[in-house]
Amino acid sequence: MRVLKFGGTSLANPERFSQAAQLIEKAHLEEQAAGVLSAPAKITNHLVALSEKAALNQPTDTHFNEAIEIFYNIINGLHAENNKFDLAGTKALIDAEFTQIKGLLEEIRQAGKVEDKVKATIDCRGEKLSIAMMKAWFEARGYSVHIVDPVKQLLAQGGYLESSVDIDESTKRVDAKSIGKDKVVLMAGFTAC
C-alpha cells in the first residue's frame, strides 16, 4: 500500500484540500493507497491554545470561533466545487465535535488544569475532522472509503501525548490485503480518540 502524508499547509483551505484529495485519488487509481491527514493549518495551534487557556480560566472564544471558521471555509469551498459534497452532514459533524470541545473546556475550567487524556482528545479533533471532510469529498465523487480505526488497528505504547506505534503489529492489524482495492483508505496523522 502506498502512503501519502499531508501536513496542515496542504489542507489549509478549500483549494489545497482539493489538491490533496486529487493526489490521493490519482494514487488510488494507480495502486492501493492511503492518505494520512493532519489538521488544516492553524487548527492544532487553536486547539492547543483552547485547553491551555481554559486551564488558566482565560477567554477561549477567539480560538474556538477561528477554528470553526477554518473548517466552515473548507467545506463551503468543497461544496462550491462539487454540489454533491454533503455540506449539511459535514457541518453537523463539525458542530458536534466543537460542542464536545466546549464541554471539555468547561470541565478544564472547573478543574483548573487539563489532564493529558483530555488534552489529547481536544488536540486530535483537527485530524478527525480532516478525515471526515476528505471522506465526504470522496463519497461525493462516488468512492467508497475505508477509515483506519486507530483504536482497533494501531498498537501504540506510551502516554496520551507522547506515544509510538508498533509498526509490525499495526501493519498486521491494518491488513491492507483485506481492504478492498476499490476503497480509498484514510487515516489520521495524530489521534488519541
Language model features: what each stretch is:
Residues M1-C193:
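Nucleotide/pyrophosphate-binding catalytic subdomain
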